[in-house]
Amino acid sequence: MKNRHEILVSFHMRELKMKEMIKDFLDELSSSSPTPGGGGASGLVGAIGCALGLMVGNLTVGKKKYKDVEDEIREIIEKLEDLKKKLVTSVDDDAENFKPLAEAYRLPKNTEEEKKHKEFVMESCLLDASLVPLQIMDLSYQSLKLFSTLNEKGSVMAISDVGVGVQCLRSALTGSI
């Protein structure tokens, strides 16, 4: 069994890793690299919104005051967990789907044949690149619908977290348009 010192050190190490991962993502996001970009940022913000909804749900479940709504909140927790995972996955998926489009922009267009080829490739790549943002939009919308129940029936101590979660999901939705 770990003693208090070992637990604190373990927590501190996890916190440092998390800060490093966030810093790395933000550094890459702010670089001149085309990915990650707005799509990946939208996916991440949506996942953060879901996480806030999950926090509200977890603060609600198991409390006497909310016993009557516990089953409904548990269902929301299950759905938000799935939506959060999909939004996290969308961060990398968006970058992968955008790479061919970024490469297509570099294709030559000196001759008519090159112009036609570039146009064809660009159209195909644009379609593929738009799929993940559309998915982010859908996942964010599905998540937002669950927040009305959290707002009405979730722990009143976490009502501000419901509001921040809603704003995150709205940003994810509009950012993916």
How should each PLM-predicted stretch be described?
Residues N3-H5, V9-F11:
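N-terminal amphipathic/hydrophobic targeting modules at extreme N-termini
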Residues K64-E103:
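A structural-propensity feature for long, helix-poor, extended segments
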Residues K17-P36:
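Short, hydrophobic/aliphatic alpha-helical segments
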Residues M21, F25, I48-M55, N97, ...:
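Amphipathic, well-ordered alpha-helical segments in soluble domains
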